[in-house]
Amino acid sequence: MTDEYYMNMALFQAQEAADQGEVPIGAVIVGADGSILAAEHNRTEALHDVTAHAEMLAIGAAAAAIGAKYLTDCTLYVTVEPCPMCAAAIGWAQIRRIVIGAADPKRGYTTMYARSPFHPRAVVLQGILADECAAVITDFFRRRR
């Protein structure tokens, strides 16, 4: 499977979030063998929990799926650049490959960190299906305002 394939899965999760009135961000964590360990979207409204971001929920679900707290052999696909909280959790989980759709110049981790918060050996790919990822979140906020 390709990065675009898994990012499309994350986009599906983002659309699910939008349909539920949540900020439309989706995340998918894939194991080294290509298996889907977790597919989540933001649930901050439904759970009344400011930490219930797609990445946080996916990290918890993937860790439970493999029975370990470190996700070193996994790849995270996320539709929008992680916020500082999620970026720190990604670093703590030691995810070694992070694939990001759209940048977030207002709230993304790059606005807060001079250095990457991710594991030192992490590979970060940005811009996979960026236009599609940006459109989902832009359309959501355009409709709400």
Regions found by a protein language model. Name each.
Residues 1-20, 36, 82-145:
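Zinc-dependent deaminase
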Residues 10, 14-17, 27, 38, ...:
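Small-residue (primarily alanine) positions within well-ordered alpha-helices
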Residues 21-25, 72:
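Short, basic and Ser/Thr-rich N-terminal targeting/leader segments
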Residues 25-34:
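Short beta-strand scaffold segments in enzyme catalytic cores
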Residues 37-44:
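Short beta->alpha transition motifs characteristic of CBS
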Residues 44, 78, 102:
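Residues that line or immediately flank small-molecule/substrate-binding pockets and catalytic motifs
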Residues 46-57:
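A short, polar/charged loop-to-alpha-helix boundary motif
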Residues 68-80:
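Immediate flanking context of iron-sulfur cluster ligation sites
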